[in-house]
């Protein structure tokens, strides 16, 4: 057993609230006195349908989702949505637009570009030579008014960038399609500013295995009949999310996280905590006299994924190893970026972030 509390800084699958894990443990063999474990429930049973509907309603309440938006709990991860969004919403359009600001929006752009009938235009990109150190302001996006949609990622998990203000377009412009995987539920925003939102659960929602999709009803009229039903949003909605067997346990766990977030005071309250957590780490980095480096423009720094390095690869490796010995786990940066990355999603307690900041100062004292 570790001498220290274990804090999981993984980018995903990520930390889950301790209270949620405790509830799941208590209900593992017998959910709510039914005698059934959730993992063994039929997805069409009244027991599971109640879990599904409560999860949907709680998410709708947390995000203030308008009535003219549908919520789906799908499979395939956010990467499936790169193509699924385009397959459903670009039909009959000559162009669609994409904003590339980091690793995942770049992959989304590349995947969408494989569609043969719709040209995916690069409306904006992050920095010279795609160095991803800054974010192009929304007013600089080269958006074609007659495009099918504009796709972007509001928070870049790998590169550690995040739009300070959640982007929105003026009335009459194409609908925004947003990858919110690594920031959904971390701060308030207006769902009505978007045509479609998707998010892999394994960061701020729950365990891996489910992807949340929030889509405006009028856009479902675009869904073509000549794509496979399993990739058609309308097919899933027409069957109340039961076109195929959903990820029942992941949905159950996500529902527990929604209830936990409500108990914390909702999104507005958790946003204040998230702001303090990010401030704690960035002040430690900026106050290190250059020992720790974060090259991201300050106004574009992510509050969810804090990236940093020492400038010495061997010292970075030592940092990750020594941190893990003190219960500060999974801090290694993404393979294409290197250095360290602290993912501080909703479920990461402030105590964990303060423990990391203390370790960073101690490490600098010993190796600086």
Curated annotation (Swiss-Prot):
Cellular component aspect of the GO annotation: cytoplasm
Recorded metabolic or biological pathway in which this protein acts: Amino-acid biosynthesis; L-serine biosynthesis; L-serine from 3-phospho-D-glycerate: step 2/3; Cofactor biosynthesis; pyridoxine 5'-phosphate biosynthesis; pyridoxine 5'-phosphate from D-erythrose 4-phosphate: step 3/5
Enzyme class of the recorded protein, top EC level: transferase
Binding positions for pyridoxal 5'-phosphate per the UniProt entry: 78-79, 104, 157, 179, 202, 244-245
Catalysed reactions, semicolon-separated: O-phospho-L-serine + 2-oxoglutarate = 3-phosphooxypyruvate + L-glutamate; 4-(phosphooxy)-L-threonine + 2-oxoglutarate = (R)-3-hydroxy-2-oxo-4-phosphooxybutanoate + L-glutamate
InterPro entries linked to this entry: Aminotrans_V_dom, Aminotrans_V_PyrdxlP_BS, Pser_aminoTfrase, PyrdxlP-dep_Trfase, PyrdxlP-dep_Trfase_major, PyrdxlP-dep_Trfase_small
Any one Gene Ontology molecular-function term assigned to this protein's record: O-phospho-L-serine:2-oxoglutarate aminotransferase activity
Alphabetical UniProt keywords: Amino-acid biosynthesis, Aminotransferase, Cytoplasm, Pyridoxal phosphate, Pyridoxine biosynthesis, Serine biosynthesis, Transferase
Primary location recorded for the protein, binned into one broad class: cytoplasm
Cofactor: pyridoxal 5'-phosphate
Known outcome of mutating residue 336 to S: In strain: Z4296
Post-translational modification N6-(pyridoxal phosphate)lysine, affected residues: 203
Outcome of substituting residue 240 to E: In strain: Z3915 and Z3524
A Gene Ontology BP annotation from the UniProt entry: pyridoxine biosynthetic process
Binding site for L-glutamate: 44
Tree of life domain: Bacteria
EC number: 2.6.1.52
Consequence recorded when altering residue 237 to L: In strain: B293, Z3524, Z3910, Z3915 and Z3918
Effect of residue 168 to C: In strain: B293, Z3910 and Z3918
Protein family membership: Belongs to the class-V pyridoxal-phosphate-dependent aminotransferase family. SerC subfamily.
Quaternary structure annotation from Swiss-Prot or TrEMBL: Homodimer.
Record's protein name: Phosphoserine aminotransferase
Natural source organism: Neisseria meningitidis serogroup A / serotype 4A (strain DSM 15465 / Z2491)
């Amino acid at each position: 057993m570790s001498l220290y509390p274990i804090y999981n800084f993984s980018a995903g699958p990520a930390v889950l609230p301790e209270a949620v894990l405790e509830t799941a443990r208590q209900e593992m063999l017998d959910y709510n006195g039914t005698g059934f474990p959730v993992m063994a429930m039929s997805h069409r049973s009244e027991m599971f349908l109640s879990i599904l509907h409560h999860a949907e309603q709680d998410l709708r309440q947390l995000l203030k989702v308008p009535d003219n938006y549908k919520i789906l709990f799908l499979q395939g991860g956010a990467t499936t949505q790169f193509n699924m969004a385009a397959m459903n919403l670009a039909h009959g359009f000559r162009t669609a637009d994409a904003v590339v600001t980091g690793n995942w929006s770049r992959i989304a752009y590349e995947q969408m570009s494989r569609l043969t009938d719709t040209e995916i235009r690069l409306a904006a990109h992050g920095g010279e030579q795609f160095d991803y150190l800054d974010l192009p302001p929304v007013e600089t996006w080269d958006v074609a008014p007659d495009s099918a949609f504009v796709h972007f990622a509001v928070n870049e998990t790998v590169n550690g960038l995040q739009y300070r203000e959640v982007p929105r377009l003026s009335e009459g412009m194409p609908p925004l399609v947003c990858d919110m995987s690594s920031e959904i539920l971390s701060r308030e925003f207006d769902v009505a500013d978007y045509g479609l939102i998707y998010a892999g659960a394994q960061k701020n929602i729950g365990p891996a295995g489910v992807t949340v999709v929030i889509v405006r009803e009028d856009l479902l009229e675009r869904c073509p009949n000549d794509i496979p039903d399993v990739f058609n949003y309308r097919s899933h909605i027409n069957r109340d999310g039961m076109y195929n067997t959903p990820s029942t346990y992941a949905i159950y766990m996500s529902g527990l996280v929604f209830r936990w977030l409500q108990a914390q005071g909702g999104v507005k309250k958790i946003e204040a905590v998230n702001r303090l957590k990010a401030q704690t780490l960035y002040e430690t980095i900026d106050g290190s006299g250059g020992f720790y480096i974060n090259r991201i423009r300050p106004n574009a720094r992510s509050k969810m994924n804090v990236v940093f390095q020492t400038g010495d690869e061997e010292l970075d490796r030592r940092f990750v190893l020594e941190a893990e010995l003190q219960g500060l786990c999974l801090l290694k940066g993404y393979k294409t970026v290197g250095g360290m990355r602290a993912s501080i999603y909703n479920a990461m307690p402030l105590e964990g972030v303060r423990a990391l900041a203390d370790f960073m100062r101690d490490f600098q004292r010993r190796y600086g």
